[in-house]
Amino acid sequence: MAFTNKSSYIALGCEGSANKLGIGVILHTPTETKILSNLRDTFVSPPGTGFLPKDTAAHHRAHFVRLAREALAEAKITPADVDCICYTKGPGMGAPLNSVAVAARALSLLWDRPLVGVNHCVGHIEMGRYITGAENPVVLYVSGGNSQVIAYAEQRYRIFGETLDIAVGNCLDRFARTLEISNDPAPGYNIEQLAKKGSKLLDIPYAVKGMDCSFSGILASADALAAQMKAGADFTPEDLCFSLQETVFAMLVEITERAMAHVGSSQVLIVGGVGCNERLQEMMGHMARERGGSVYATDERFCIDNGIMIAHAGLLAYETGFRTSLEESTCTQRFRTDEVFIKWRD
């Protein structure tokens, strides 16, 4: 199907900042936004291990062409229908980011379509806003690589608080390695299921300073408790997962509530892979309701890294005139959320 009315645009989005390769197609018209396809292929490493950049990049290279063809087929479009190709510029892991950037660049040249480099964090936020309908929330962005409390002001997503060391998702993933928990479908998901069966709340440090937090010491403490358990201590892996979750999520709720009070917001939007966790959503919901507010979150199709969020955020930028030239179509491991000028919002 060919769209000739240029008040309507179609974007192909390519995401590959970590172990998920995602490709999605989105349509923007003056009256609606429509997801045409949203496909993903995940690199899963063996239990007790993480994913190495070189292996993850090889996975993305191996599956990109197939996934792109399937995304176009599901969307029922051809390359001629695509107005722009959006890709994750950063932040993320260097090798997988670069593998997808090179592939997006190749499509741009093959199809003669402009490129739009997208900030991964902004992609999460804009997709969350679209799916949930949250108007102007405080955003808790929590994933394997990022932990930030964000609010919008003067055409920037301002970071009010963040982790001072590792991300909360990285803390959970690395603890899954300690317990040799399966990485399929995701270590954080498997920790969540074990935590539901835990009953003992063990003593784990709580590290919050203002709207910032720290997780590296908490991980070290949890690792030490795991060693005690293996030596015969009277608690289970389920108790450890329960205690770790309760502690780190309480920290996230505290810094989010502080940001809500600071900016006068009654809405919370949780985005990022950790945002799928039902216990985090439950705890955040209790806090928000006590303040007369509400919490918004998406399901795993949109909170876990995906191509459609890159297509959506990229197309929002494209419609304001933004383009990424071939010479500037690089990627970067460090790309702050507040570096992006949000021209499409008032």
From Swiss-Prot:
Which reaction is recorded as catalysed by this protein? L-threonylcarbamoyladenylate + adenosine(37) in tRNA = N(6)-L-threonylcarbamoyladenosine(37) in tRNA + AMP + H(+)
Intracellular or extracellular location(s): Cytoplasm; Nucleus
* UniProt cross-references to SUPFAM superfamilies, sorted A to Z: Actin-like ATPase domain (SSF53067)
What top-tier enzyme class does this entry carry?
Answer: transferase
Coiled-coil regions listed: none
Q: Which cofactor does it need?
A: a divalent metal cation
Entry function: Component of the EKC/KEOPS complex that is required for the formation of a threonylcarbamoyl group on adenosine at position 37 (t(6)A37) in tRNAs that read codons beginning with adenine. The complex is probably involved in the transfer of the threonylcarbamoyl moiety of threonylcarbamoyl-AMP (TC-AMP) to the N6 group of A37. KAE1 likely plays a direct catalytic role in this reaction, but requires other protein(s) of the complex to fulfill this activity. The EKC/KEOPS complex also promotes both telomere uncapping and telomere elongation.
> What name goes with this protein?
tRNA N6-adenosine threonylcarbamoyltransferase
Name of the gene this protein is made from = KAE1
